[in-house]
Amino acid sequence: MDNPARRQFFKTSLIATALSALPSSLLAATRQALRIPPLLETRRGKPIFLSLDSVQYPLEMGKTVEVWGFNGHYLGPTIKIRKGDFAKLNYRNNLPQGVSMSIQGLQASGELLGGVGRVLQPKETWSPIIPITQAASTCWYHSVSLANSAYQTYRGLAGMWIIEDEQSLKSGLPHKYGVNDIPLILQDMRLNNQGLQLFQPNQTALFGNRLFVNGQEAPYVNVPRGWVRLRLVNASLSRHYELRLDDEREMRLIASDQGFLPQAKVLKSIVLAPSERSELLIDLNEGESVRLIAGEKRDFLHVFTSLFADENELVDNTVLELRPEGLASVFSKQAEPQFNTDAVANLSNKVVQERQFHFDVNTGMVNDKHFDPKRVTNAKLNTTERWTLTANGIMGFRIQGAKFLIESINDTSVEQSEIAWKDSVLINGKVQILVKFEHMSSNNHPFLFGSANLMLADKGCIRLLVVQ
């Protein structure tokens, strides 16, 4: 016989279970204010000190745990530098294991970038001096240690680079760091009851059920009314995001990995693969608070239906709540920004070689072969090649020390107005790219290319690249 009391008890228990499963930060009346990474702005050869440290930090409110980071902080400071300057880096490894560091997107030689050929042992230091020759862009630095990059990056070895040039400084774009030019480093994680990061090393992917930005869940930021610039880095190990605003208002994409688009692209959502970066402009001249979210907008009932959802689904899909304050800017109705870029002109470069790479997301093989450090892909300096990338599942791809233009996605050509220099892309079927090699690498200090899913990369879904 149906028992109403038992049925009500089950409903109450279900609700209690759902609410207890939520992190406390999501149940609080107010969100945490967004943590802005410290800014290290270097001029005229001022050195940049980066110590790799074990630090204490509360990923979950009230639960301080050991994580990794730089200069005593979880995650790293944002390094800001201008084209034409030199970056005098000073790394020191205070961690108990060796680490290989690299700067994804930075255009420099293999010897100066570091990478897999430069293992920084415990207590060891390394001080490369890197000339900055590229156009304005957003890059990021993280661990690339062979077979250990996912774990080390997941623990907190990640940070942002901002490169400015004359065009970006005179563009009129929002540029006040942490005020209307906001750095956002996205990670998904799993935590145990003590708030410690959970990591399973023998998997080909890691999908956390909790979304962090700059080391916080679902934070807010107060911003002045007007246009706000978001610099996004997907530092997740495997997850790609489809980002949108919860009120479906338009956004403007102005830059990708390696720099500006020819003109701003108006869109309502954008996909961000692991390692990929994007710069968005949001119009906050009018209206109230708005949330940047990953995936579709959710209602309150999702708290309960999520009990039966995929265990990899994010508990809260809020990236950031933007809270505008003050009066609207008198310059609020600015024209659609346009930028000078040589990207489109390079579509007609002479192609010296064509290659095909197929990535197996189940086995980690590239072109049906496991990783072998003796197997090297050789390219000639100052040439352009056409690469066709395919995979048997959705996978992020990235290349170090070089840059590329996307010619087509699944045999559909990319509009010239959307052409921009890149170093990371999502493969969901087939992608055809033009790769330009402007910097040297060697057998001792090679570049890497392959899976941007660091779990899969640690399984060997990568290749070494020597440019001479």
Swiss-Prot record:
Keyword check for Signal, yes or no: yes
Which CDD domains does the entry mention? CuRO_2_CueO_FtsP, CuRO_3_CueO_FtsP
User: Cross-referenced Gene3D superfamilies, in alphabetical order?
Assistant: Cupredoxins - blue copper proteins
GO MF term list: copper ion binding
Instruction: List the keywords (alphabetical).
Output: Cell cycle, Cell division, Periplasm, Signal
The biological process GO terms on file are: FtsZ-dependent cytokinesis
| GO CC annotations on file | cell division site; outer membrane-bounded periplasmic space
Modifications made to the protein after synthesis: Predicted to be exported by the Tat system. The position of the signal peptide cleavage has not been experimentally proven.
**Compartmental location:** Periplasm
Q: Does the keyword Lipoprotein apply?
A: no
Coiled coil feature spans: none
Location, primary (coarse class): periplasm
Annotated signal sequence is 1-33
| Domain of life where this protein originates | Bacteria
A UniProt-annotated Pfam family: Cu-oxidase_3
What is the role of this chain? Answer: Cell division protein that is required for growth during stress conditions. May be involved in protecting or stabilizing the divisomal assembly under conditions of stress.
**Record's HAMAP family?**
FtsP
Instruction: Give the record's family classification.
Output: Belongs to the FtsP family.
Can you name this protein?
A: Cell division protein FtsP
Q: Which organism is it from?
A: Pasteurella multocida (strain Pm70)
This chain is encoded by the gene named: ftsP
